[in-house]
């Protein structure tokens, strides 16, 4: 038995989908444990590019089981669209399993998300997908789960009760039109019936696989710095992308987690508002954004760009228990005369090495950089660190030293062949 968790160790968009897809080759089960359709991942399979939001990357392998765990908030409409998209492109989905305990995103969640964000003076940068309101209902114990969605009478009763309260908020607080009960019930009950064949107790599926000695890969969404507890609160998501979220969001005990792979870029990116100490506002930032095609998979918003921040990565290592790193997008830095790594912050005249919780302190933090010479050589063909130009080797090795975690995979381009194994996590 072996289990590996793939987590984003920055602010999301680190290339987790590609790494998960790469590690899926030796996995028997691939499971999502949190988030919803607010974060997309891009996978290149058989020369074709696929963009998924809910379905795990393992769906492309017919001999593997793909799981949407109980910690995910699920929009049935988005999921049906994604399944149709895969079917239209010749991808079978018989290997998908959906937790009966996952909570369902309904139209009032999306409308409330939009209305709340519009009303705020300070924007969090929501994707308007209803994720936050769905998790709020879950915490308030009024959420509707997949198991409820499949039961005609229970769904009818819960939806009726919820809609009374939601329409009060929508109409009286946000001056929105009320939602129609019959329209929602008919549409979403029908969607639930379309998904019924995929629904099961996924905790049993995953634990049975582990007990049988199979390899299980857990796939997170977003990143550690967007974690509701350990991220840049309140500019965070509504769930726990950290590795600890696996136990809650998939129904697997912590003693069954063996490895945690932290995925990161060779620089840093962020979508939406919030602290970003190493952010670049110059031509170098623009160059990295365009070279790296740094635009959101779901939102299409241009991502904010900054230098690699080892303070952030050490924070991710500590709170998520990273055992190895997966370094992506090294090729994007090719051609820069100088590359920088943030090794610490200056705060009120003091050098600090840990990420502050206070937004006031974060705004006052000035990055302390190490400057290293860049490289001009094409590295997209390199298949090991030893094949990299000397300056690129120095950069990679220094990143690992500052973070204190070994690099297990190194990517020098978007294709699978450009992802190089330096250490096999399944045999570690």
Swiss-Prot record:
Positions annotated as active site in the UniProt record: 13, 41
Subcellular location as annotated: Cytoplasm
Annotated residues for binding of IMP: 13-16, 38-41, 127, 141, 222, 237, 301
Record's GO cellular component terms: cytoplasm
UniProt KW keywords: Cytoplasm, GTP-binding, Ligase, Magnesium, Metal-binding, Nucleotide-binding, Purine biosynthesis
Cofactor(s) needed: Mg(2+)
Pfam families: Adenylsucc_synt
Binding-site residues for GTP, renumbered to this chain: 12-18, 40-42, 303, 329-331, 411-413
Protein name as it appears in the record: Adenylosuccinate synthetase
Gene, per the UniProt record: purA
């Amino acid at each position: 038995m072996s289990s590996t968790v793939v987590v984003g160790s920055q602010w999301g968009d680190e290339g987790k989908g590609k790494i998960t897809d790469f590690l899926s080759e030796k996995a028997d089960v691939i499971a999502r444990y949190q988030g919803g359709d607010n974060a997309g991942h891009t996978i290149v399979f058989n020369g074709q590019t696929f963009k998924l939001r809910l379905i795990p990357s393992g769906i492309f392998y017919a001999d593997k089981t793909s799981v949407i765990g109980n910690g995910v908030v699920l929009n049935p409409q988005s999921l049906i669209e994604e399944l149709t998209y895969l079917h239209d492109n010749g991808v079978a989905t018989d290997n998908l399993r959906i937790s009966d305990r996952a909570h369902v995103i309904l139209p009032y969640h999306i409308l409330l998300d939009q209305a709340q964000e519009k009303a705020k003076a300070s924007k969090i940068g929501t994707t308007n997908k209803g994720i936050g309101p769905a998790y709020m209902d879950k915490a308030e114990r009024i959420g509707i789960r997949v198991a409820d969605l499949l039961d005609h009478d229970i769904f009818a009763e819960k939806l009726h009760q919820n809609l009374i309260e939601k329409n009060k908020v929508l109409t009286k607080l946000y001056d929105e039109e009320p939602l129609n009960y019959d329209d929602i019930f008919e549409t979403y009950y029908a969607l639930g019936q379309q998904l019924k064949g995929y629904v099961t107790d996924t905790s049993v599926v995953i634990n049975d696989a582990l007990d049988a000695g199979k390899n299980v890969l857990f796939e997170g969404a977003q990143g550690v710095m967007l974690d509701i507890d350990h991220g840049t609160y309140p500019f965070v998501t509504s769930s726990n992308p950290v590795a600890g979220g696996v136990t809650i969001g998939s129904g697997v005990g912590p003693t069954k987690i063996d490895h945690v792979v932290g995925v990161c870029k060779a620089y840093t990116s962020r979508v939406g508002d919030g602290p970003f100490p190493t952010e670049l506002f110059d031509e170098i930032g623009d160059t990295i954004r365009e070279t790296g095609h740094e635009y959101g998979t779901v939102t299409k918003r241009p991502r904010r760009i900054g230098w690699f921040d080892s303070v952030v990565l050490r924070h991710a290592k500590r709170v998520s228990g990273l055992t190895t790193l997966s370094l992506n997008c090294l090729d994007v830095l090719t051609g820069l005369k100088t590359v920088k790594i943030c090794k610490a912050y200056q705060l009120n005249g003091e050098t600090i090495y840990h990420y502050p919780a206070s937004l006031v302190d974060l705004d006052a933090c000035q990055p302390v950089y190490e400057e290293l010479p860049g490289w001009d050589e094409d590295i997209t063909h390199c298949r090991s660190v030893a094949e990299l130009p000397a300056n690129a080797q120095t950069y990679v090795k220094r990143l690992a030293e500052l973070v204190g975690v070994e690099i297990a995979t190194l990517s020098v381009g978007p294709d699978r062949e450009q992802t190089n194994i330096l250490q096999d996590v399944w045999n570690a």
